[in-house]
């Protein structure tokens, strides 16, 4: 009896230790750089900070990062000299040049701080596509404002998942969902939906199990699957090759770059690649062209119509059916 109790104690202690060691990189301090007009765009519908905290509480994340807003490079440099910052978010709206200039200057001075850019609307994306090479010298990823403060939660989680991926998958056998999408407009819509679905399923699993007083809900939330974004074929293959045993789903667009060129069959080839690995990994194909439904069926993959008026519901339904957490 004492041996069995010792084993149970050791297992629980081990689980608790692992939970505590997961997600070593946490975004606690975010510097938001936006001129007064762009800042007004996100603040006009209510208290920005309260809404951010609300988004975190909705998914049982009790500690939201602190946002510090500044309107100029000089103000940004002052904050950076005074305290540690985990993530810099630059807003770009009417003035698209100044955020780029600031970003490059900050990258030279603080190369280890991740920078993301948030543009005000979809119409601004065309301009940034023309300067991609310059943009990504200092900016990690571009997102588009979709009217919801949830995009800020997603931006923080995107960086956290990317930074913690290797360690957490090895330490805690954490699961991974791969989203392959090169459209800024669409991944800015998909990621909030995916994170919400992942957090909902994780909470359902946690609350369906006997509660262990030694491990808080907050700690258990750390075992949620990571959502990893790839924007081309090679990035996706890298994730599949390195984290195959952890993958619980691949959601892929059809058309994106492969070997540096736009490939109309890239998503099809990627799912074929997944199938050839021999691992059982549920796959979903997403496309604006409804005729790709047939190709998805041939690959035994689910299909999502990107032009569907019920896109949010469709993603939720398909994710629940095909990406149910183990």
Q: Which role does the model predict for each range below?
A:
Residues 118-120, 286, 306:
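Hydrophobic/aromatic residues positioned on beta-strands within the core alpha/beta folds
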Residues 6-12, 41-44, 48-53, 62-64, ...:
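Conserved phosphotransfer microenvironments
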Residues 130-142, 295-304:
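As written
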Residues 2, 7, 17-53, 67-69, ...:
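Conserved acidic segment of CheY-like receiver
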Residues 321-326:
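Conserved small/polar residues in nucleotide/adenosyl-binding loops
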Residues 69-71, 142-146, 230-231, 303-306:
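Short acidic-hydrophobic, aromatic-tinged amphipathic segments that line or gate anion-handling sites
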Residues 146-159, 189, 292-293, 307-319:
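C-terminal output helix
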Residues 54-57, 121-123, 213-214, 288-292:
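Short, polar loop motifs at secondary-structure junctions
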